[in-house]
UniProtKB/Swiss-Prot annotation:
Protein encoded by which gene: fusA
Signal peptide: none
Residues holding GTP: 27-34, 93-97, 147-150
One Gene Ontology cellular component annotation held by this UniProt entry: cytosol
Compartment(s) of residence: Cytoplasm
GO MF, one example: translation elongation factor activity
Protein name, entry field: Elongation factor 2
Family of the protein in this entry: Belongs to the TRAFAC class translation factor GTPase superfamily. Classic translation factor GTPase family. EF-G/EF-2 subfamily.
Provenance organism: Saccharolobus solfataricus (strain ATCC 35092 / DSM 1617 / JCM 11322 / P2) (Sulfolobus solfataricus)
Length: 736
């Protein structure tokens, strides 16, 4: 099928929203997502069927092909016919490695359905559970694809009955997760049911797959599969692939079970749009109206060396055309579209227009970032935007980078800026004291891949420090009220600090409590769910990005309103670098009880207010049993039962603790937690102690206090590394 024909077909079909499906492929690392995508691409004539499965067309970064894992969420529009009708399938391949789960979160926002790929031997792994939970939270309907069924025959040598039991076991586990994380109105309908056909069994590498209804129609059963793999030549396997092509099985299921944008947006918009559902924008989105105002949700920014920044996202309403002016809600500016296109893997194909319900790539919006909402410029005064994306992990590992060749410094700074635009989970900052460029990421692999991208895409070789784990500072007790004076002694602030309880931290972290909420609504939730005093909760006036809260309990203080913005800026700055080790503060409630403000604006500028606010917060902090929090990783390890002892020995040696051990078939599953600081050589140790027979997944679990026995040692090391005085600051240092 010639390629241009497909692009034409895709563009004309995009206008009929009942013929559009937006689906993603999600899974644990190495369970076969990208291979699955390739096989689908081959079927629509985009890559040659001979190399599908090895082409890794969607893994178009060199890094991805070498490591065999997907780093970026790539997307592509496919054409597929089912029951005599043509359909457009917008397909997004998402990374499965936990270090890149930020990209998964962004992709899910634009999908209506997901193909969950599970390895038949390894079963449900941590990352499968995480992405499935995320997709159910975003109201994305799952279809199950049990991949690598050949391993049950070739490696485990199971009989047809044993194979069936194994597959049913995986289906049961997926349904348990849907039951646990799905919303009540969708649970029943979205359950995986082999008879209905929303589970596919197959092997993406060998290009065959079928659902039960398809197998019955074509007269295939598990015995045919076993025969295909036990036969002496490949002809039976090729026959199986011809009789039950995987692309037909998966895409037919997607068309049948994934809702079209008109159906999906009716129930997804109320979940992901925060704003009035009665205004014109929301109404247009609820109906996926191509003639309404434009609402374009941007989930990905890529740097194209020839064209500049390309914004990719979903058109929830309206129709994108070049020349159209859009208002960027977060950037608070308007920009004009220069070009509209759709992605066919790494290449962009130009389009005159892309209507609601589709995925589009746009040039001209270079002020946008991932998570931006772009709307028709005439609606800039209408309140609302998409709910903030919740990333499952936080950057927890940092390295300092400098170019090997000092002449490359400006080039490196520019490249780092571009990388951080493409990947919002990569944080780039300059250490003011040492002038070092610091790169923070979700894990060791995330940073390694970023450095490889620097080398390959921008030609910059860098020298790096060994990875440093990022800590947070916090407190464990309530302080008294301290007075903070401004340097000119004309302004005074009376502040105290106390730790936030776990429930409050959870509500802020998962986005239930937001700074921009109605104060009464916020107070009601905090009172009912986190035991706050209602009146105190109503007076929260700021929440920063590290889950700290500022409460204003003053009444009738003269001139306070005029300087309140400066006070809050002082609070945010103080929270960025705590007194213990200049690490960010987390989980602290700062209460302003009273203040004295000078009447003359000349005497109450930022240079006076910032130190006064900071000093009283820090004095309180140091008297409240301060501590450091370290990032903890959750491990999910599968290992033959006789090697459990070897694995637990490695974990306990690394200050880890075992949470659970269970038996699945002939493997044991160990769930454990271990500090990120101890995980640096974890992979090689696990491999060494199990002779390479353990496979595992990791994900960020939580922040936990560093044990008191090593606290001082850790603080001293961080202070030394940052060039700070060895001795810790005292309360008196902040009280002048």
């Amino acid at each position: 099928m010639p390629r241009y024909k497909t692009v034409e077909q895709v563009l004309s079909l995009m206008k009929d929203r009942t013929r559009v499906r937006n689906i993603g492929i999600i899974a644990h690392v190495d369970h076969g997502k990208t291979t699955t995508s390739d096989t689908l691409l081959a079927a629509s004539g985009i890559i040659s069927p001979k190399v599908a499965g090895e082409a890794l067309a969607l893994d178009y970064l060199n890094v991805e092909q070498q490591r065999g894992i997907t780093v970026k969420a790539a997307n592509i529009s496919l054409y597929h016919e089912a029951e005599g009708k043509g359909y457009v399938i917008n397909l997004i391949d998402t990374p499965g490695h936990v270090d890149f789960s930020g990209r998964v979160t962004r992709s899910l926002r634009v999908l209506d359905g997901s193909i969950v790929v599970v390895d038949a031997v390894e079963g449900i792994m941590t990352q499968t559970e995480t992405v499935l939970r995320q997709s159910l939270e975003e109201r994305v309907r799952p279809i199950l694809f049990i991949n690598k069924v050949d391993r049950l025959v070739k490696e485990l040598k199971l009989s047809p009955q044993e194979m069936l039991n194994r597959l049913l076991d995986i289906i049961r586990q997926v349904n348990n997760l849907i039951d646990m994380y799905g919303e009540p109105e969708f649970k029943e309908k979205w359950m995986i049911n082999p008879q209905a056909g929303n589970v596919i069994f197959g092997s993406a590498k060998d290009k065959w797959g079928f659902s039960l209804p398809m197998a019955q129609k074509k007269g295939i059963n598990m015995k045919n599969v076993i025969d295909a793999y036990t036969a002496s030549d490949k002809s039976k396997l090729e026959e199986l692939a011809a009789q039950a092509p995987i692309n037909e099985a998966l895409l037919d299921a997607a068309i049948k079970f994934v809702p079209n944008p008109i159906e999906a947006q009716k129930y997804r918009i109320p979940k992901i749009w925060k704003g009035d559902l009665d205004n014109e924008l929301a109404k247009a989105m609820l109906n996926a109206d191509p003639n309404g105002p434009i609402v374009f949700m941007i989930t990905d920014m890529k740097v194209d060396p020839h064209a500049g920044l390309v914004a990719t996202g979903r058109v929830f309403s309206g129709t994108l055309r070049s020349g159209e002016e859009l208002w960027l809600v977060n950037a608070k500016t308007s920009q004009r579209i220069l070009q509209v296109s759709l992605y066919m893997g790494p290449t962009r194909e130009l389009a005159e227009e892309i209507p609601a319900g589709n995925i589009a790539a746009v040039l001209g919006l270079d002020r946008a970032r991932s998570g931006e909402t772009a709307i028709s410029v005439g609606f800039s005064n209408v309140q609302g935007s998409f709910e903030r994306l919740h990333y499952i992990s936080e950057p927890v590992v940092t390295i300092a980078v400098e170019p090997k060749n000092p002449k490359d410094l400006t080039k490196m700074i520019d490249a780092l800026r571009k990388l951080s635009i493409e990947d919002p989970n990569l944080v780039v900052k300059i250490n003011e004291e040492t002038g070092e460029y610091l790169l923070s990421g979700m894990g060791f692999l995330h940073l390694e891949v970023s450095l490889q991208l620097l080398r390959e895409n921008y030609g910059i070789d860098v020298v790096t420090t060994p990875p440093i784990v990022v800590y947070r500072e916090s407190i464990r007790a309530k302080s008294q009220v301290f007075e903070g004076k401004s340097p000119n002694k004309h302004n005074k602030f009376y502040l105290s600090v106390e730790p936030l309880n776990d429930k409050t931290i959870e509500l802020i972290s998962n986005g239930t409590i937001r700074e921009d909420m109605d104060s009464k609504e916020m107070a009601k939730i905090l009172r009912d769910e986190a035991s706050w005093d209602y009146d105190e909760a109503k007076r929260i006036i700021a929440i920063d990005e590290n889950v700290n809260v500022f409460v204003d309990l003053t009444s009738g203080v003269q001139h306070l309103r005029e300087v309140m913005d400066t006070v809050l800026q002082g609070f945010r700055l103080a929270m960025k670098e705590g007194p213990l080790a200049h690490e960010p503060i987390r989980g602290v409630k700062v209460i302003l009880h009273d203040a004295v403000i000078h009447e003359d604006p000349a005497h109450r500028g930022p240079a006076q207010i910032y130190p006064a606010v900071r000093n009283s917060i820090f004095a309180g902090f140091l008297t409240s049993r301060p501590t450091l929090l370290e990032p903890i990783q959750k491990l999910d390890i599968r290992v033959p039962a006789d090697l459990i002892g070897n694995v637990t020995a490695v974990i306990t040696r690394k200050r880890g603790k075992i949470l659970d051990v269970s038996q699945i078939a002939n493997m044991s599953r160990i769930t454990a937690e271990i500090p990120v600081s101890e995980s640096y050589d974890m992979a090689s140790e696990l491999r060494g102690s199990t002779g390479g027979r353990a496979f595992w997944g990791t994900e960020f679990s939580r922040w936990a206090p560093v044990p008191d026995s090593i606290l001082l040692d850790v603080v001293t090391k961080i202070r030394e590394r940052k060039g700070l005085p060895k001795e810790l600051p005292k309360v008196e240092d902040f009280l002048s």
